[in-house]
């Protein structure tokens, strides 16, 4: 754990100087909603051994908080999030590209539980968002990302054999 750090794409949604009502209407499941330039620069700087200040995203308010989190560079940098392989400049910085493939039923159930419990959303709003933006954007952008992955992990992350292989690949890269 001391030799790794992680960085999530979800913290770099683009700044929105709009009202709450306007922010709620934004399609956050499209690659254009992320500040990919900022995220790519952060990854580049971490790989160069620099400490970075990462924004914190407030999902209940649909905007970045004023606070930031300091992230120290480590030997292993784990990136998580959608669209990581979509941007060539970012994708080129990733040594091992892992796509965790999860069944659609599991994805919607996880989203409902997370958004209702952690983000205070109504069930109706989560289902509407899933049908209007999440599912179509998944089919348009996320499914094609599988082709860019070095490793595809089936079973939504509950695949010990696949993760043992990933750990071995990381160890090999470090040596």
Where are these regions (language model features)?
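Short gly/ser/thr-rich secondary-structure transition/capping motifs
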Residues: 56-65, 77-82, 132-136
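Amphipathic alpha-helical transducer elements in NTP-driven molecular machines
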Residues: 33-36, 40, 101, 120-123, ...
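Anionic, Ser/Thr-rich low-complexity intrinsically disordered regions
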Residues: 89, 99-100, 105, 121-131, ...
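ATP-dependent NMP and nucleoside kinases share a basic, alpha-helical "lid"
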Residues: 65-119
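Single conserved hydrophobic/aromatic residue that forms the stacking wall/gate
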Residues: 2-13
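Conserved nucleotide-sensing/catalytic segment adjacent to the nucleotide-binding pocket
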Residues: 15-61
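NTP-dependent small-molecule kinase module
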Residues: 72-73, 113, 135-175
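Receiver (REC) domain switch/active-site residues of two-component response regulators
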Residues: 11, 95, 150
């Amino acid at each position: 754990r001391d030799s790794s750090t992680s960085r999530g794409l979800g913290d770099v949604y683009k700044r929105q100087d709009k009202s709450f009502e306007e922010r709620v209407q934004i399609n956050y499941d499209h690659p254009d909603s992320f500040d990919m330039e900022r995220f790519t620069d952060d990854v580049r700087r971490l790989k160069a051994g620099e400490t970075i200040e990462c924004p914190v995203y407030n999902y209940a308010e649909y905007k970045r908080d004023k606070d930031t989190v300091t992230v120290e560079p480590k030997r292993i940098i784990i990136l998580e999030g959608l669209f990581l392989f979509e941007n060539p400049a970012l994708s080129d910085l990733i040594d091992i590209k892992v796509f965790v493939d999860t069944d659609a039923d599991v994805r919607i159930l996880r989203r409902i539980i997370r958004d209702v419990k952690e983000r205070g959303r109504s069930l109706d709003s989560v289902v509407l968002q899933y049908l209007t933006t999440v599912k179509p954007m998944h089919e348009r952008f996320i499914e094609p990302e599988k082709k860019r992955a070095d490793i595809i992990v089936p079973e939504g992350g509950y695949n010990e054999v696949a993760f043992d292989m990933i750990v071995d690949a990381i160890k090999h890269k470090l040596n």
